[in-house]
A protein has these predicted regions:
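Structured alpha-helical segments in the cores of large, soluble enzyme domains
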Residues: 52-64, 85-98, 140-159
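Extended, charge-enriched "interface" segments that sit outside catalytic cores
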Residues: 1-85, 101
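Active-site pocket-lining segments that scaffold enzyme catalytic pockets across diverse folds
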Residues: 66-126
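Cofactor-binding active-site loop characterized by glycine-rich and histidine/acidic residues
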Residues: 105-165
Length: 165
C-alpha cells in the first residue's frame, strides 16, 4: 500500500499538474492516467535543457514587462500569465526537428503574438519597437501591416542541436 501511495503522490502531487477532469470520454481519461501512472519519470530535463527553458521563460517575461512599461495603454495582446508558451514552443520545435521536421508554420491568435515573433521567430526588438512607434518597415508579403500584431514574419530557427528549421 505504501508503494502505491508513493507512486500516486509522485505522479499527481509533484511540481507539474495535469488537468484531465474536464475530459468526458472514458477512453481518453484512461489513456492519460495510464501514461501518467506507468512512467517513473514524466520529465527528466538535463541541466542544459533546464537552462534553455529558463532563458526562454526569462526572455518572455522581460519582453512583456518592458512592453507594459514602455507602451502603457497600447494594445499589444500581452502574453502575461502565459509566458510558458515560449519555452513550450521552443521545446515543440526542438522535438520536431529531432524527428526530421524541417519547416514549421505558426498560425495563432493575437494574444502573445509579439512575444512569439521576438522570442521564437527571432524578430528583432528594433523591428517591433519601430512598429509601436508607427514606423512599419518590413516585407509587404508578411501581412497587411494595418496593426503591429497583424505583421507576419519568416526566419530560420536554431534548435538546441544547432539545426535550422
Amino acid at each position: 500500500m505504501r508503494d502505491i501511495f508513493t507512486k500516486l503522490k509522485n505522479t499527481y502531487c509533484g511540481t507539474i499538474g495535469f488537468e484531465i477532469g474536464y475530459v468526458r470520454v472514458k477512453e481518453e481519461v484512461d489513456f492519460f492516467r495510464n501514461k501518467l501512472e506507468k512512467s517513473d519519470k514524466l520529465i527528466n530535463f538535463s541541466a542544459k535543457q533546464k537552462e534553455r527553458i529558463l532563458r526562454k521563460l526569462n526572455q518572455a517575461v522581460v519582453f512583456e514587462k518592458f512592453l507594459g512599461t514602455k507602451y502603457i495603454g497600447e494594445k499589444r495582446f500581452s502574453l502575461e500569465g502565459g509566458e510558458t508558451t515560449i519555452p513550450a514552443l521552443d521545446g515543440i520545435i526542438n522535438t520536431a526537428s529531432r524527428t526530421g521536421v524541417e519547416e514549421v508554420v505558426v498560425g495563432m491568435a493575437h494574444r502573445g503574438r509579439l512575444n512569439v515573433l521576438v522570442n521564437i521567430l527571432g524578430k528583432t526588438y528594433e523591428e517591433v519597437f519601430n512598429e509601436f512607434e508607427g514606423n512599419m518597415v518590413g516585407d509587404p508579403t508578411m501581412g497587411d501591416g494595418d496593426v503591429k500584431y497583424h505583421m507576419g514574419y519568416a526566419s530560420h530557427y536554431t534548435t538546441d542541436e544547432d539545426k535550422h528549421v
